[in-house]
Amino acid sequence: MKNFYRSMVATWIAVLISTSVIRATEPIDIGSRRELLVDHHLIERLDGVRLELHRPVRREVVFRPDAAWEGNGSGYQSVFQDGDRFRIYYRGGHHPNSKAYKTSRNSWETLCVAESKDGIHWTRPELGIVEFNGSTTNNLILDAAMVSDFGGSPAHTAVFKDSNPDCPPEERYKIVIVGRNPKGLYLMVSGDGLHFKLKSEKPFATEGAFDSQNLMFWDSVGGVYREYHRAFEKGGYKGVRGIMTAVSKTPTSFPKPQWLKYPNATEQALYTNQIQPYFRAPHIFMGFPMRYNDRGWSPSMTKLPGLEERQHRAKQHPRYGTTVTDAAFMTSRDGMTFHRWSEAFIRPGPARQDTWVYGDNFIFWGMVPTKSHLQGAPDEISLYATEGYWEGNATSFRRYTIRMDGFVSVQAPFSGGKLLTKPLKFDGSQLEMNFSTSAAGSVRVEIQDDAGKPVTGFTLADCNEQFGDQLERVVS
């Protein structure tokens, strides 16, 4: 059998990795796929090393939804690469409880789209689909009138490009949208991602609250559609905000949903879920939920920016002024049980205008590869998050970047350490490793037999010392 193990192991100092492939216990068959060490699924033991969550780098504001039909209520964005361009779908309009809405009265029951060639510079296409103030020269693709038959809410949507190879071309693009008649999640379809129609008058999900961004995608590994939506633990709108899921072979009908599980995690109100297959390792599901934290009024709360607007929102409901939000990170191998990190993936950051508000750090659903700002460096992953939700006249779309596969790493101190995997079965002829060391750090790899003894020719002594910073170094 040829030996192949592709692992994401990033360390900035030194780590020794002991990889076990043949042991008495049943091995985990990883084939020839890329594996990320985002959890303990493949790890038997850590000696002197630890798993560390990495946070993306805050970059520039790439877009502001400040057109007359847009505003500070823009949210529930979806982003994906579509051929040679990128698309962001987002809610337009002002938040109905904001000061700006009192004067403009532009409804947030709209869906807009922006496009980009590089994921950094975004423009509004002039589509001629929806009329606003007597003109169709805008980037609107949906308004409330277009979905009134089923009480659809363009303010609560998720848009995706269906990767199911059997999907009809005229239904390649899909919108998950909340409807009221009857209450549930509905599916809209399109062949171009701009002109959508209702797929079925019957909702595909009816058990849940749905007052959030609810989503669906094709799981290419499992060969099923997965849907994730908002629900409350006590039913209706009572209790802690949580996430339910269901799977189906068809996107138009799902069985009774089940609650996600988070072993060893503290209870946390999760406002969104943003779950998706990781595009470089689609057997791993990643979620970036927005965490909802009502901190109440305190001297510290009054020290945060935007006190006047915070107090204005609190007059409508106290939590509108006292809730602050950030983004978390979680992963799953089965789409149901998630390892959720307690630390924030994106924090509110330095206290400044349009930060530390309810809806801040809402990560868009989706991630895309973009060029590094360093010439000659490999591509990075770009994520996007909202700032300034329901403040001022518009939100801001902030870009964040993170290393390819670099969400979590195995990290060691200068004194070094070891990682021993569980028994593995794999195919291939070489090992590739995503890693980073200091100028003084290094990595070595060893293969052991079922007794924990090094396999001749694959010992630490046989492995050349690896140092540097590369995404796909072939270990020799």
Which positions does each model-derived feature cover?
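Carbohydrate-active catalytic/glycan-binding domains of CAZyme proteins
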Residues: 1, 24-476
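Aromatic (phenylalanine/tyrosine) cluster motif
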Residues: 4-5
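Bacterial N-terminal signal peptides
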Residues: 8-19
